[in-house]
């Protein structure tokens, strides 16, 4: 019985850790999901954005006390506007998705939500992109990746 409990806890800890992508692994993944050039945004800009928001980590969350909302996952999808975490007051859930889906290793739903956001608001919806990527040479974010 103890062995089953320990195994269960180990499996739980694996799912809770999330995934921290390597640079080129994420670049290939985002390209495969069709983000390279999506709505005019280059792959290097998406890479800069995800580095600035989460350091390529699917498990990152950040609470925003002013809006009582939380940003989730590799793209830091906000619970007030884009996903439902069940606790953010007056949440809109523009992507029609649970915020917990933004924290998964499989970033399919996170990418779909990011596409929705950029389609409606443009890349400037992300503060990290405005502060760290806009009007900068972002080529280093994909340099060395065999794409």
Swiss-Prot record:
State the Gene3D superfamilies in the record.
Answer: 1.10.530.10
Q: In the record, what terms sit under GO molecular function? A: lysozyme activity
Catalytic residues (positions): 53, 71
Disulfide pairs here are: 24-145, 48-133, 83-99, 95-113
Tell me the keywords, alphabetical order: Antimicrobial, Bacteriolytic enzyme, Disulfide bond, Glycosidase, Hydrolase, Signal
Enzyme class name: hydrolase
User: Which EC numbers does the record give?
Assistant: 3.2.1.17
**Is-annotated flag, keyword Hydrolase?**
yes
Annotated ranges, domain C-type lysozyme:
19-147
Give the record's GO biological process terms: defense response to Gram-negative bacterium; defense response to Gram-positive bacterium; killing of cells of another organism
Q: Reaction catalysed?
A: Hydrolysis of (1->4)-beta-linkages between N-acetylmuramic acid and N-acetyl-D-glucosamine residues in a peptidoglycan and between N-acetyl-D-glucosamine residues in chitodextrins
- Provide the leader sequence positions: 1-18
Question: This protein's superkingdom?
Answer: Eukaryota
Q: What does this protein do?
A: Lysozymes have primarily a bacteriolytic function; those in tissues and body fluids are associated with the monocyte-macrophage system and enhance the activity of immunoagents.
Report the sequence similarity comment from the record.
Belongs to the glycosyl hydrolase 22 family.
Name by which UniProt lists this protein: Lysozyme C, intestinal isozyme
**Species the sequence originates in:** Bos taurus
């Amino acid at each position: 019985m103890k062995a089953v409990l320990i195994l269960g806890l180990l499996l739980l800890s694996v799912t809770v850790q999330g995934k921290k992508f390597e640079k080129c692994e994420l670049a290939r993944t985002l390209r495969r999901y069709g983000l390279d050039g999506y709505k005019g945004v280059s792959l290097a800009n998406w890479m800069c954005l995800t580095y600035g928001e989460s350091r390529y980590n699917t498990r990152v969350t950040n609470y925003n006390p002013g809006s009582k909302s939380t940003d989730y996952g590799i793209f830091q999808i906000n619970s007030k506007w884009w996903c439902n975490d069940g606790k953010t007051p007056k949440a809109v859930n523009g992507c029609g998705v649970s915020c917990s889906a933004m924290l998964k290793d499989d970033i399919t739903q996170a990418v779909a939500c990011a596409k929705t956001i950029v389609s409606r608001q443009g890349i400037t919806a992300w503060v990290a992109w405005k502060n760290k990527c806009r009007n900068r040479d972002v080529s280093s974010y994909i340099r060395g990746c065999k794409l």
